[in-house]
Amino acid sequence: MADQNYIHAKDAYNTLCTALDNIGWKYKRMDDELKIMFGVNGDDLAMNFLIIVDADRQLVRLLSLLPFKMDENKRVEGAIATCVVNYLLADGSFDYDLEEGNILFRLTSSFRESLLSQELFHYMVSVSCHTIDKYNDQFLALNNGDITITEFIEKNS
């Protein structure tokens, strides 16, 4: 079964690479690990992505760590803001590390007993870029004291 899972994962990985090639994106392949890294310039902050094809769990995970940490005195507000945003999202979520202040965007799709299309990968990348670009500057503004948690909530209600 493990060999079959790896073959299925390798197919998903190759489809993902083809999808990125077809939209003309530059990326770094890590074929042995079934991982891809790439970056995108957003409206305000750069976004770095790691896509992992997990053969054992039959998942594709798209991850993007925001390029700043919430300051220690803003961590509780960061947790509240993350909950507010996650409530609004249909696909993907922001994971928040209260201890470290890190915010990580994650979008996952299963390929167990199914095939993932190039269109799905385009969607995953597109929705991730849009979502991160929409909220990363708001999280940063909250961290920098440019907006209050009340203003953050009002803007996203």
List where the protein language model places each region.
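Amphipathic alpha-helical segments
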Residues: Y6-Y27
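Ser/Thr-rich, low-complexity intrinsically disordered terminal regions
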Residues: I23-M47, V53-V60, P67
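Short, surface-exposed coil-to-beta transition loops
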Residues: L45-N48, L89-D91
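Short, internal acidic amphipathic alpha-helical interface segments
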Residues: L65-N102
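A generic structural motif
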Residues: L66-M70, S109-L116
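Beta-strand/loop substructures that line and gate deep hydrophobic ligand-binding cavities in soluble
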Residues: D95, G101-S114
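Long, contiguous binding/interaction regions
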Residues: L115, H122-D133, A141
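Short, highly charged C-terminal tails/helix-capping segments
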Residues: L140-S157
